[in-house]
Amino acid sequence: MKVVLDTNALMMPVELDVRLFDELDRIMPPGYELFVPEAVLNELATLSSGRGKEATAASVGADLAERATPVEHEAAYADDAVLEVARELGATVVTNDRPLRDRLFEAGIPVIGLRGHNTLERNEP
């Protein structure tokens, strides 16, 4: 099974105290593969150049993204890229971005999002 990581998913460990990879291991079948769109990597790099908690979260997110396979795409914006890559790969997306989640559901793409304080849950469209 393939999983695409969104920018805010990679920032969850710092911002929301979510043990991202432990949670994915808990809810996904063994052998799942992680992918990250290039636009997400670019967004993390931009955010990490700032100051404060968001910059720290983005910096940690960029480090965590190294566990995923980078994917090139046509879309210019990170959310569009996540949708494009998920469609192409037939993947589930990890995001806590409500507008993106709604777009993914409309496209028939499953979403893993926050449930409760720091637990992830997979939802079908």
Predicted regions and their residues:
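Domain-level signal for Mg2+-assisted phosphodiester chemistry and nucleotide/NA-binding surfaces
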Residues: 1-67
